[in-house]
């Protein structure tokens, strides 16, 4: 369905998130989008995990919950017409917790981070799915999956001569999402749904710890 503006007149409560962040996309290593805005192959597809270490939406606690954002844009992100699908852990049982996560990650709750900005580039937003999300947080060796839907495994770069694991980091003092991230690559990165169906294994990945607040 087409994304429409929220008609709610309810005041947005103060919110805060601190999360492990695992980003994977279809760009070559390092992802040129973060430097000049244009993807390696002219389009952008990404699967991103947020493992919330601590968080709240007003009085609603969000600690320990997982959210995956799946995006696809036909061109660069800022050229719009994108598609978004949220996958939220089944562990978010209460309706108010689910609504809080949807408000934040859809951009309706405004605030810091990519959510509100990305929302302006999305033409189609799919109904959120509440699913089992399997998560392993281990820096540049993190992984996450949703059974029968997506599978992501991240791995470090390795020196081809010595076999030594590389310590690769990117620093962006004015970065929108992160200021410092560990650069990695995907051993596996795929999603299979009727709307989003791609396999971009062997491409770019980042691991970071991010912190946002709003509104």
Describe every region a protein language model picked out.
Residues 8-57:
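N-terminal ordered "arm"
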Residues 1-14, 212-215:
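Basic/polar N-terminal segments that are highly enriched at the extreme N-terminus
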Residues 1, 52, 93-96:
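Extended hydrophobic/Leu-rich segments
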Residues 4-6, 13, 26-30, 63-67, ...:
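A short linear-motif detector with a strong N-terminal bias
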Residues 48-73:
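Short, intrinsically disordered, low-complexity segments enriched in Ser/Thr and Pro
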Residues 16, 39-46, 60, 79-87, ...:
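Short, well-ordered strand-loop elements centered on a beta-strand within folded domains, enriched
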Residues 64-215:
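Internal, well-folded beta-alpha domain core
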